[in-house]
Amino acid sequence: MRRRGKYLIFELDGDEELIIHLRMTGQLRLNEGEYTRLIFHIDGMKLYFSDLRRMGEMHLVRKGSYENIEGLATMGPEPLSESFTLSYLMDVLRKKGGKIKAVLMDQAVVAGIGNIYANEILFEAGIHPGRPAKSLTQKEIEAIYNATKKILQEALAAGGETFSNYVNIYGEAGTYQPRVY
């Protein structure tokens, strides 16, 4: 299994992959939940897909065939990868219209940043979320770039931010404490 942005990619036997996006309320569980929508039978075990709001999505595709999965086919670089550089971010922000928060959340610009982390990044950088992306100075873009790396590394180390009863595979809630909310 691997991850790309907010997509989970499961390599199956043969030439196929199962692509899952949990959206806001989706969960993969080892026990049946109130909102179980699908049960996977794997080597004598069961894996339950639970989704209160029915927003999650699944795709069964040939390995590497992501062109028909809208968000995955056009996804930008991972924010903690070597391909997410300061020069890349400067180039994108100077060309992209719209408010900086919306641009950061655009998965074609940078993979995996959602509402909470966009707010955290901009707060750390001292940039108003409603600022037009094209109006940012080089110094402000550098602050956003550095804040992106810092906030996401902190969140990863803390197991992420947890709303409601969402937990990791070991049943533990994330301990990242947002500064904005």
Question: Model regions: which residues?
Answer:
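Structured catalytic/nucleic-acid-binding cores of DNA maintenance enzymes
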Residues: M1-Y181
